[in-house]
UniProtKB/Swiss-Prot annotation:
Family as reported in the entry's similarity comment: Belongs to the major facilitator superfamily. Sugar transporter (TC 2.A.1.1) family.
Official protein name in the record: Sugar transport protein 6
Family annotation (PANTHER family): SOLUTE CARRIER FAMILY 2, FACILITATED GLUCOSE TRANSPORTER, SUGAR TRANSPORT PROTEIN 6
Species for this entry: Arabidopsis thaliana
Cytoplasmic topological domain: 1-20, 468-507
Length: 507
């Protein structure tokens, strides 16, 4: 399939969607599958009695008591740390991964990620005490930090610009598939006593092995090769992934971008310059907003949440499987729409969509779920339905676009550093939500859904006023085509920086 990459201000680069690029995309995106599996598995394991008896006996005792506060049964800081420690480690690892991405390349960084994943899987599945369990989660976090740094950059840099949105969302698609697989594994291993939780935690080893050996088959990105002065290799790589002979214009554009990037000795300091503020601010706030939609609170703790509203253990795990299935299907919708309707439309539509769902869930719980007892069956089913509809809206918008937009808007000279900051922000806010959600649920009860509703209003307004459309724009032409025409961000495009654009046009 051939496409011509063009926009009003950018050159046109001919490219084909080759089989080889598709294979590279699918192998790299396995990193997203592991991330999704780790998101989904922790909530289901946290609801398993064998796991709770082994590591969190106080929570297990509370869970058995019918008259225990519905909203507080699982409120335990160490139980929350089991989930959240992964994201704390990922936060730190993403900065190290930024350096390896720049110095060694995107492919070796993915290989490091797979090794960390395998170590983490061994420690968590074989854990004999809480310390060993948490250390294993930390190693998984190192893998997440390296994988989430390298994979979206890799996908953005090998994709033709007109297909970049859809191909980049494959990462988020694999995250959702990982969550679904984890939910299915949780459902079946919950009945395997007393070591079902070990099987569930050990399952992440399979995609980690696939990523480790699959990464040996994929090509390094042309941008990464040229950035490290391997110009001839970069040119051959570009010809291979584009599937056309005439790649000289795009090659020269990448070389020029790399020349400019090489003049930046401190990319993190460069991020603080006025011209870097638009992608920097948007990249950070997208990570904040993505987490404060409340999505990971639901995905982490879906089985726990469904037990809270009255489902039994098996029914709660099955409901999580249904939610995960909706998540996957809706992500396919996002892949189809993102390069057709654009990024802004999806962000704005889903903000209204998710707000309505959160309000309805909050109202039902406030009205019908007391401190003890359970919801009636009809109300519980309505909650599950609106959780699914809510997940649907997130899956085709803020989920994938929270990764896509930062990966495509930073210029090359700050791309690795800027995306490292974005990944770190994502991991930090994910850590905050994972560590605090069960305590917030205990303290705020149904009010937690109104809390997230308030955040959805804020992020919808931010998207309306401050996030420009980037559909179809070449990745190294964002400054000229996106930021300079924007009503607000153009104030940061100072005249002294215009030599960048003049040199680029001359090249």
């Amino acid at each position: 399939m051939a496409v011509v990459v063009s926009n009003a201000n950018a050159p046109a680069f001919e490219a084909k969607m080759t089989v080889y690029v598709f294979i590279c995309v699918m192998i790299a995106a396995v990193g997203g599958l592991i991330f999704g599996y780790d998101i989904g598995i922790s909530g289901g394991v946290s609801a398993m009695d064998d796991f709770l008896k082994e590591f969190f006996p106080a929570v297990w005792e509370r869970k058995k008591h019918v008259h225990e506060n519905n909203y507080c049964k699982y409120d335990n800081q160490f139980l929350q740390l089991f989930t959240s420690s992964l994201y704390l480690a990922a936060l730190v690892a993403s900065f190290v991964a930024s350096a390896t991405c720049s110095k060694l390349g995107r492919r070796p960084t993915m290989q490091f990620a797979s090794i960390f994943f395998l170590i983490g899987v061994g420690l968590t599945a074989g854990a004999v005490n809480l310390v060993m369990l948490i250390i294993g989660r930390l190693f998984l976090g190192f893998g997440v930090g390296f994988g989430n740094q390298a994979v979206p950059l890799f996908l953005s840099e090998i994709a033709p610009a007109q297909l970049r949105g859809g191909l980049n969302i494959v990462f988020q698609l694999m995250v959702t598939i990982g969550i679904l697989i984890a939910n299915i594994v949780n459902y079946f291993t919950a009945t395997v006593h007393p070591y079902g939780w070990r099987i569930a935690l050990g399952g992440a080893g399979i995609p980690a092995v696939i990523l480790l050996f699959g990464s040996l088959l994929i090509i390094e990105t042309p941008t990464s090769l040229i950035e490290r002065n391997k110009n001839e290799e970069g040119k051959e790589a570009l010809r291979k992934i584009r599937g056309v002979d005439d790649i000289n214009d795009e090659y020269e554009s990448i070389v020029h971008a790399c020349d400019i990037a090489s003049q930046v000795k401190d990319p993190y300091r460069k991020l603080l310059k006025p011209a870097s503020r638009p992608p920097f601010i948007i990249g950070m706030l997208l990570q904040l907003f993505q987490q404060f939609t409340g999505i990971n609170a639901i995905m982490f703790y879906a089985p726990v949440l469904f037990q809270t509203v009255g489902f039994g253990s098996d029914a709660a795990l099955l409901s999580a499987v249904i939610t995960g299935s909706i998540n996957v299907l809706a992500t396919f919708v996002g892949i189809y729409l993102v390069d057709r309707t654009g990024r802004r439309f999806l962000l704005l539509q889903s903000s209204v969509h998710m707000l309505i769902c959160q309000l309805i869930i909050g109202i039902i719980l406030a009205k019908d779920l007391g401190v003890t007892g359970t919801l009636g069956r009809p109300q519980a089913l309505v909650v599950v339905i609106f959780v699914c509809v809510y997940v649907m809206g997130f899956a085709w918008s803020w989920g994938p676009l929270g990764w896509l937009i930062p990966s495509e808007t930073f210029p090359l000279e700050t791309r690795s550093a800027g995306f490292a900051v974005a990944v770190s922000c994502n991991m930090f806010f994910t850590f905050v939500i994972a560590q605090a959600f069960l305590s917030m649920l205990c303290g705020m009860r149904s009010g937690i859904f109104f809390f997230f509703s308030g955040w959805i209003i804020v992020m919808g307004l931010f998207a309306f006023f401050f996030i420009p459309e980037t559909k179809g724009i070449a990745i190294d032409d964002m400054r000229e085509s996106v930021w300079k025409p924007h009503w607000f961000w153009k104030r940061y495009m100072l005249p002294e920086d215009d030599h960048h654009d003049i040199e680029k046009r001359n090249a």
